[in-house]
A protein has these predicted regions:
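Short, small-residue-biased leader/transition segments that mark boundaries at the very start
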Residues: 1-5
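An anion/phosphate-binding loop that grips the pyrophosphate of nucleotide cofactors and donors
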Residues: 9
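Short glycine-/small-residue-rich Rossmann-like dinucleotide-binding loops
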Residues: 16-18, 41-42, 65, 152
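Internal alpha-helical scaffold of NAD(P)-dependent oxidoreductase catalytic cores
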Residues: 79-177
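Interdomain hinge/lid region at the active-site interface
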Residues: 161-232
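Long, positively charged, glycine-interspersed low-complexity recognition regions
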Residues: 233-245
Length: 245
């Protein structure tokens, strides 16, 4: 079978929870030792470490499509899920080769090219990125929102039947990802704990400041609401430009 994969220049996409990545890599090492490899796992440092431990870095290019919903399973499949989505593609191995003055292996270049081609096939937009930068960024815009969604859901639920009955747009928007299967959230956040803690500390500083200002003789969150509005406007402008491209 491995000869068939080699002749077809196969690209293997690892799409499993982080806890199963090592087992899948071992199977690839045994059955498809010459195939290019990518993945769609939401944390890149941990996956790359598993790849490095097995000496498979010259045929691995990490990937992460910024798409998905809180639902999972075949029944929740979406035909255009990746359309206009940013798709992070890592290039650490190439950068390290260049830093050492070494030639980048042809297989890695071909694998990188195939990963980019795959993103084009599903109408996503490739974003070259270093592993550490990826994990730091998604800690802020993906993993921290999961933590806050869980917190908001718990606080809202603690309000009892009345709060539950009155919950509507803003609450449901803010807690949507709390509907994600708990094990998936745990693996995602715990695997990226160092970067997530840094983002969480920044968020806690903002929360403490907001609390102090609300607990003053003249309560105000003007500074926070203005900063949040401007930040969201910048984010919308950036993602909007991608959608219109």
């Amino acid at each position: 079978a491995s000869d068939v994969y080699k002749r077809q220049n196969a690209l293997i996409v690892i799409a499993v929870p982080m806890t199963a990545v090592g087992e899948v890599l071992d199977a690839i090492q045994e059955h498809a030792p010459s195939c290019g490899i990518t993945d769609v796992v939401s944390v890149k440092t941990a996956v790359r470490q598993q790849v490095l431990e097995r000496g498979m870095e010259s045929r691995y290019v990490g990937g992460h499509p910024m798409a998905g919903t809180s639902k999972s399973g075949w029944d929740n499949s979406q035909r255009d899920l990746f359309r206009r989505a940013a798709w992070g593609i890592t290039y650490d191995y190439a950068a390290e080769c260049e830093a050492r003055g070494e030639k980048i292996p042809k297989q890695w270049i071909e694998t990188f090219t195939e990963v980019v081609r795959m993103t084009q096939m599903v109408h996503a937009e490739a974003v070259p990125i270093r592993v550490a930068n990826h994990d730091a960024a998604v800690a802020r815009i993906s993993h921290l929102p999961h933590v806050f969604a869980e917190i908001l859901a718990v606080v809202g639920d603690n309000g009892g039947i009345l709060a539950q009955s009155l919950s509507a747009g803003s609450f449901k928007d803010a807690t949507r990802v709390a509907g994600t299967h708990p094990e998936l959230v745990q693996q995602m956040c715990e695997t990226n704990a160092p970067a997530l803690v840094e983002a969480l500390d920044e968020a806690l500083d903002l929360l403490r400041d907001a609390r102090e200002k609300l607990d003053s003789p003249e309560p105000s969150i003007a500074e926070l609401s203005d900063a949040g509005y401007r930040a969201r406007t910048r984010i919308d402008a950036r993602s909007g430009a991608r959608k219109e491209s």
